[in-house]
Amino acid sequence: MPATTTNWKTIAAQHREKQRDAVPAEWLLPEKQLQGLKNTGDGNGSKLIESKAVQRSGLLTEKEIVITEKYTAAELLSKMHSQELSSEEVTVAFSKRASLAQQLTSCLTEIMFKEGIQRAKELDEQLKTTGKLAGPLHGLPISLKDSYRVKGHHATVGYVEFLRQPIPDHNSALVDLLLDAGAVLYCKTNLPQTMMTADSENNIFGRTLNPHNTSLTAGGSTGGEGALVAFRGSPLGVGSDIAGSIRIPSLCCGIYGFKPTSERVPFGGQSEYPFPKDHLPGIAPVGGPMANSIEDLELFMKITLAQRPWNYDPTVVDIPWRDLGEGDAKLTIGIMAEDPEYPLHPPVRRALAKAASALENAGHKLVYLPQDPKRNAGLGGRIGFQLFSIMGPDLDTVSREIGEPLVNSVAIAVHPFANGNFPVPPDLDTPTKLSRLNEVRFEYLKAWQETYRDNKLDVILAPGAVTTAIPHDTYGVPIYTLMWNVLDFPAGIIPFGKSSKFEDSEHVKAKAPFDPDYIPEATDGAPTAIQIIAPRYRDEECLRAMRIVDKTIRNSRAEKL
């Protein structure tokens, strides 16, 4: 794959210069001012959100701060469609804020501010002269994970080698759908090499930092979106998820994220390596939204499915969105048992307990599910990782083919079950191994289907991960998200509370591979979160339950963690 005419470092540096040149000069802050914004006093990373870095920067006007902080995406659409706000001023506001996010957290890849603002002007003119909207997303700025192809822009997915290849001359299926719905695309966001680690770093764009605490990971693989949305540099972001890549950055960055059932949101036409994931048997990757409210997750899903996505991507099933209304029904919620091989860090365990208490006090029925080896998280993780071992090449092959070194989070990700702890003997031929593994996967699915059925569950309440955001390159194995990809169940993250070095000091480290260390001082103040899961193709029920749960825990004293 790699050419040898130009050193990869030179190519990467040249592209970073092009990226910087795409930002208006007046939006670039002097290095001394940037260092001042990063210096928040305690020596444990920069608390960019808590220290109000945006306000201190002076880059945005008061109106632009209101536009980017006060409104949901749904509210912005309402104001633009009534012409109370113009798409141009909304797009400029989010572009300026995204440019600051980039300077402080390295969350962006392809910068499309100029094109986005021009499209916003055209949409404003269309609405003014004809009175007609371009579509239900008319004028709304939307950010995209780098893997989504946008015509005329690179989709490197973090590989320098991809900069040597022709710039895409076509859009991914979802990009076409969003444009037809009237969206404004203004930036793409960072991810890791391989898109298979929980840290977002590569040799082109560097490492994305968490705006809550820059010494902690922003998560991965959609970490750029997580950081940008948390920084309020985007009203609505689009990521992808095959093992937790939407949900892990969401919980790390304190935002909402949703992984739909596969084949409901168009995924075709993305840039991918080493896994051509949308064509191989195994775990299906999915696209999904990331935002600062559940309302905006629902907005994305409703509008996407209303656009008849099966006409954009032949793999999408023809299932229109079902509107379940705004009711506050009482739920029956299964409380997932903690896998003893992967014990939760104290802040995660406390957030789950507080959420469960609030839900029970509000009259929801809780069913505490006992530990069962037929359906525990570790088994789901082992199934998932063995499927990945079949789907793609080993890391040595990846490094050789891309012609550049692996970043640390990828290099240290030696297969967590390489010692043979697989559900199926790894030395079988591939067809036999895949057949046997699918049998194990079916039994795992059956165990969970029976759990929902026998307990009459609406949803499951579970952790999103063993930990909160933790120091870079230490995340561990994402079994509490990967298991739901193995099952292809819709799942969403709700931010809830914060870690506390005073309340969360006790932890016994597990013996499981890649169990991350818990360091109370390092993660103090990091966002905590819970995960809600529904059965396959019950995406509408999952989001409805997320809305009910979110409202319940916000209205309770439990939020004061």
Residues of each region from the PLM?
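Acyltransferase
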Residues: 87-91, 121, 171-172, 346-372, ...
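Acidic-enriched catalytic cores of C-N bond-cleaving enzymes acting on peptides and small amides
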Residues: 2-59, 280, 287, 292-319, ...
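An N-terminal boundary/leader segment
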Residues: 1-125, 361-363, 555-561
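Structural helix-boundary/capping segments
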Residues: 100, 176, 180, 230-336, ...
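Short helix-loop capping/hinge segments that flank enzyme active sites or metal/cofactor-binding pockets
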Residues: 54-60, 64, 138-160, 325-336, ...
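Short glycine/serine-rich loop/turn segments
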Residues: 136-287, 336-338, 460-477, 502
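Short, surface-exposed loop/helix-turn segments at secondary-structure junctions
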Residues: 383, 464-482, 501-516
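N-terminal, positively charged, Ser/Thr/Ala/Gly-biased leader segments
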Residues: 84, 101-163
